[in-house]
């Protein structure tokens, strides 16, 4: 398992994250090539080496060309974009599905926080700082770099916040900014004496949406270390984000895996229906899976005026939220959709192939603490074998399960 550890002793921002990942080995040329797949212009990327309190680090900057031409510093340039515009731009791009998913997760995490703070629906969130070109580039570049590194599991140290005040689009706000604090609910944070904003909303969104667990540096075989520089010079410590990359190690050859499960962010869409025929409900379920839903199910409910109906529940990733939502509004009779964001704990899993008298059958395995605790023959393989050999489904299933059990025991 390939692990990424975020050592955020001076906080985290989008540009620090990108700089650290490039410093750890991601080619900057790869990020530049991939970013060209976005329908985004008016900027150029700048990479350089700087020294922060004795530590050499990679500094990443997004230079807004329109602002340069107008004689203004790039940080004062803030394009105003809606969340839906940004997600649509990412979805329509030729970026890989993993990059789209990671970037969508980060933006959705920030949008949910902004919506709560401003008291508006998520789809109406109007971004200022995070809608600016430089922040869009920071987030998508982070997704590109994580995908390029093939990271399986991310751990972070507690997040330092700083204190004081900052000026943003709505005026002078306290540090940490309201969006940062809202995003980091449930995340271990630490305060310190530094009167600066150490963690930005973009940095908080990256942490909340991408990190699987929090704590000290785990036991691992280190393969790369990277430092990403922030802009400000801190008085007593280097303003850098350190990332450590390596492979999971075990304490002993027979010891359990250090990582028993991981957290994933899923998005919930729901609506109640009492005036649709069963055939239409079946069509809706099929269509939602085609749109990228992770799961779709109906729950019987009684609605107003004692009408029997169903509660339609859809689980999906951030990348496919809007597609599923639009499909529900188009293909069902609902007048609105409830949306929520959940975090789920999932076991490590893999798939093995076993030989049976009916042919090869794939078997899904659930793994906990390094041990296989459950094995489930794949339905489609079992079904195909049963139909091909004209035998009972359960006969094929039982033999595949037995062969998988023997494989684990080395028989």
Swiss-Prot record:
Gene3D superfamilies: mk0293 like domain (3.10.20.300), Transcriptional regulatory protein pf0864 domain like (3.30.70.1380). One of its GO terms (biological process) is protein maturation. It comes from the Bacteria. It catalyses: Ni(II)-pyridinium-3,5-bisthiocarboxylate mononucleotide = pyridinium-3,5-bisthiocarboxylate mononucleotide + Ni(2+). Signal peptide: none annotated. Keywords: Lyase, Nickel. The keyword Membrane does not apply. Pfam families: Ni_insertion (PF01969). Belongs to the LarC family. Involved in the biosynthesis of a nickel-pincer cofactor ((SCS)Ni(II) pincer complex). Binds Ni(2+), and functions in nickel delivery to pyridinium-3,5-bisthiocarboxylic acid mononucleotide (P2TMN), to form the mature cofactor. Is thus probably required for the activation of nickel-pincer cofactor-dependent enzymes. This is Pyridinium-3,5-bisthiocarboxylic acid mononucleotide nickel insertion protein. The lineage of its organism: Bacteria, Bacillati, Bacillota, Bacilli, Bacillales. The gene is larC.
């Amino acid at each position: 398992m390939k692990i990424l550890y975020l050592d955020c002793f001076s906080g985290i921002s989008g540009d620090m994250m990108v700089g650290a990942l490039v410093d750890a080995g991601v080619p900057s040329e790869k990020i530049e090539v991939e970013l060209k797949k976005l329908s985004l212009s008016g900027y150029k990327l700048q990479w350089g080496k700087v020294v922060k309190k004795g530590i050499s680090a990679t500094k990443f900057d997004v230079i807004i060309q329109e602002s340069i031409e107008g004689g203004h510093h790039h940080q004062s340039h803030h394009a105003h974009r809606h969340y839906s515009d940004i997600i649509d731009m990412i979805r329509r791009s030729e970026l890989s599905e993993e990059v789209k998913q990671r970037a969508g997760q980060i933006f959705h995490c920030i949008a949910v926080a902004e919506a709560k703070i401003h008291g508006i629906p998520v789809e109406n969130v109007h971004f200022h700082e995070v809608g600016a070109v430089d922040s869009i580039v920071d987030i998508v570049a982070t997704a590109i770099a994580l995908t390029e590194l093939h990271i399986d599991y991310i751990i972070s140290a507690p997040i330092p916040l700083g204190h004081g005040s900052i000026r943003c689009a709505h005026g002078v706000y306290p540090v940490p900014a309201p969006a940062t604090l809202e995003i980091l609910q449930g995340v271990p944070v630490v305060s310190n004496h530094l009167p600066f904003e150490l963690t930005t909303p973009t940095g908080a969104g990256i942490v909340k949406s991408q990190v699987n667990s929090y704590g000290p540096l785990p036991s691992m075989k280190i393969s790369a270390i990277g430092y990403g520089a922030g802009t400000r010079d801190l008085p007593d410590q280097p303003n850098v984000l350190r990332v450590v990359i390596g492979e999971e190690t075990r304490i002993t050859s027979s010891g359990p895996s250090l990582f028993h499960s991981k957290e994933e962010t899923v998005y919930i869409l729901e609506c109640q229906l009492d005036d649709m025929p069963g055939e239409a409900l079946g069509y809706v379920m099929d269509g939602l899976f085609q749109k990228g839903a992770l799961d779709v199910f109906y729950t019987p409910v009684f609605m107003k005026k004692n009408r029997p109906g169903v509660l339609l529940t859809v689980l999906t990733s951030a990348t496919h939220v809007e597609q599923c939502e639009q499909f529900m509004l188009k293909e069902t009779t609902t007048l609105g959709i409830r949306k929520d964001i959940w975090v789920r704990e999932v076991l490590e899993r893999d798939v093995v192939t076993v030989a049976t008298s009916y042919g090869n059958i794939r078997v899904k395995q659930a793994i906990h603490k390094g041990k296989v605790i459950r094995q489930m023959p794949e339905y489609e393989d079992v079904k195909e074998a049963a139909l091909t050999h004209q035998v009972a489904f359960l006969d094929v299933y039982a033999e595949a399960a037995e062969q998988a059990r023997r494989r684990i025991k080395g028989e």
